[in-house]
Amino acid sequence: MGQKIHPTGFRLAVSRNWASRWYANNRDFAGMLAEDIKVREYLKAKLKNAAVSRILIERPAKNARITIYSARPGVVIGKKGEDIENLKKELASRLGVPVAVNIEEVRKPEIDAKLIADSITQQLEKRIMFRRAMKRAMQNAMRLGAQGIKIMSSGRLNGIEIARTEWYREGRVPLHTLRADIDYGTSEAFTTYGVIGLKVWVYKGDTLGRNDLPAVETPRPEEERRPRGPRRDGRPGGDRAGAGRGPRRPMGGNAAPADGSDKPAGAGGTDATAVKRVRKVDAPATAADGKGE
């Protein structure tokens, strides 16, 4: 199950949040969703060289707020903010409402799944060996704090006639664990031999809730230990008998008595008289009852 399903959709409302956050009734929902898809396609094509990781779209009260997560915010903003102003006007004309655009910088693009996939596809389009590009990306991700990474490429690798799939993994990638923070990204490389698809899974650790906070384990309180008394052999030991317990039963209380009786020792009390049982044995008879003499 966890190996096949989309990692982000599998964790929605558990440890992941939606990329489009707004509410609409049944009449307007389809149209607004189509607008979101067109806006994402437009931004993907326009900001192709800006290393865009993800796009968040919000629609509060007849407005729109779009947050762009990019590893190169300077490319999105442009000189003196000219590009960002033109981008706001274009998005406002497409959505029909005032649009506010926020730019968030991605601090570590080496452990972002989408940016890793885009970087590998750019190298494949420049005729770089796919194994070298994949292993280099894995080494950079593990060096900068990723706990696990898996990269899969499929298509006519190295220009061979028969398409195949190859994947490499380093560390651990628990796809079925809901609390695991799995970043997933895809990309496509358009080469002269055909299209090569890239899939990247990055495991960044465990999270609590949808705030992407690191999981903090609360230490268990140490058990209270009672002071230990001296042991029988003189070494310092522990008094294993609990406080308030009665005297222990003597060893061998249920053992068979030495006199051969079938009652446990001490069952009749100290004043009881011990009765010894004697087994009666018949005397052997003579050969002719004494008449043979």
Curated annotation (Swiss-Prot):
GO terms for biological process: translation. Residues 219-238 have a biased composition (Basic and acidic residues). Residues 39-107 form the KH type-2 domain. Pfam families: KH_2, Ribosomal_S3_C. It comes from the Bacteria. SUPFAM superfamilies: Prokaryotic type KH domain (KH-domain type II) (SSF54814), Ribosomal protein S3 C-terminal domain (SSF54821). Signal peptide: none annotated. SMART domains: KH (SM00322). One of its GO terms (cellular component) is cytosolic small ribosomal subunit. Keywords: Ribonucleoprotein, Ribosomal protein, RNA-binding, rRNA-binding. Residues 210-293 are annotated as: Disordered. The keyword Ribonucleoprotein applies. HAMAP family: Ribosomal_uS3_B. Belongs to the universal ribosomal protein uS3 family. Part of the 30S ribosomal subunit. Forms a tight complex with proteins S10 and S14. Binds the lower part of the 30S subunit head. Binds mRNA in the 70S ribosome, positioning it for translation. PANTHER family: 30S/40S RIBOSOMAL PROTEIN S3 (PTHR11760), SMALL RIBOSOMAL SUBUNIT PROTEIN US3C (PTHR11760:SF19). This is Small ribosomal subunit protein uS3. The gene is rpsC.
